[in-house]
Amino acid sequence: GAWGLFYSVSSEEPDYYIRSRLENVTRTPLNQQTLQNGLALLQLDPLIKTIQAELTPGSTDGKSVLLVNLEEAKALSVEVSTDNYRPQNIGSYEGTIALSHGNVLGWGDKFSGEYSITEGLNLYNLHYNLPINPMDGRIGLHYWNTDSKITETLFNIFDIRNQTETLGVEYRQPIYRTLQTEWTLGLNLDIRNNRSSLEGVSFCFSQPCIDGKTNLTVLRFSQEWLNRTPNQVFAARSQLNFGINAFDSTVVNIEPNQEFFSWLGQFQFVNRFSNNWLLLGRFYAQIAGDPLPIIEQFSLGGIDTVRGYAKNEIVTDNALLGSLELRIPLTQDPEVLQITSFVEGGTGWNNLLPDPDPATLGGIGLGLRWLVANGLTVRLDYGIPLVSVDNSGNSLQEQGVYFSVRYRKAF
């Protein structure tokens, strides 16, 4: 029947943010199962700490009253971290401070910003998005700025500098959502500007480039699938990337140029066993229909791809990557201390330039994850390369050792 909606809210969460989502699942005639599923989905919202609801008969025949008690989660968080994850040629040791707020204007809008620094890198990253419908469709803006200088001993005398700016608009729309399954579509437009110089003079290190400048406009269309159960999560993502001649793109008549196509596919899973062991898998593929500008290529090597190698050991148009990791808890609370073992491998090839030699990387190794205190985490990984590469460096990263220390505080 009809229904009335009343709130008992123990926070300043705006009524309309929750009301619009509740109205999406409380259409007449009221279905209690649909309502329960909708409330369970709301519980997954990072803005909500707890939500309780009670459906009671109303004072008028045929009407029901839904009493909702809501406690808002802390929306503001600050994180500081240090690690050695960056490429060695700009300084692998990195410090980062990041800030995020999940409800800036009270509309469920999200803002995040971070600043990172190494010996040769300054990086700024800003992102803002806003929900536009009860299905959590969002529009957003993002801006990235990386200003780097080669600091390796053999090359720092040449004063090689590079600056890349990316300004993008995005639209992300879930089209089907249940507790178990989500389907989402996304559309992004990125405008990317790159500037490079050698000894203070504009210089082209790769194409497309004119007088040390590369301007790209990239349209990206993504499709995402997520399936979750209490002990398993599967996620897949497909992204089509189109380089288009728009917004002052750099136009050259040789390849690679401003017009290109590539596809990026990603599949990930997490499986929790009865003894709280975790098995994680990642499988990525990038296939390019054309030679790609270097800032659109796929890199292998480093903490996020193949451990045991320096970051960006191989950079190619096309790539395949696979990773399996087992996490074994050593404490009663499985999140406090974990030992990890992993095996990873990847291969890459180009559409125009010669393929790298070697073109394939593989690594095995061990790691440790330690929740030292509330918000303070330490991570250590050691990867052993299975394929030899020409590498004379002696940094921790080039020896297959990666570390990070992070502290996060919510307010």
Report each predicted region and the residues it spans.
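Outer-membrane beta-barrel "beta-signal"
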Residues: 99, 370, 375, 397-411
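Periplasmic polypeptide-binding modules associated with outer-membrane biogenesis and secretion
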Residues: 1-86, 98, 114-123, 263, ...
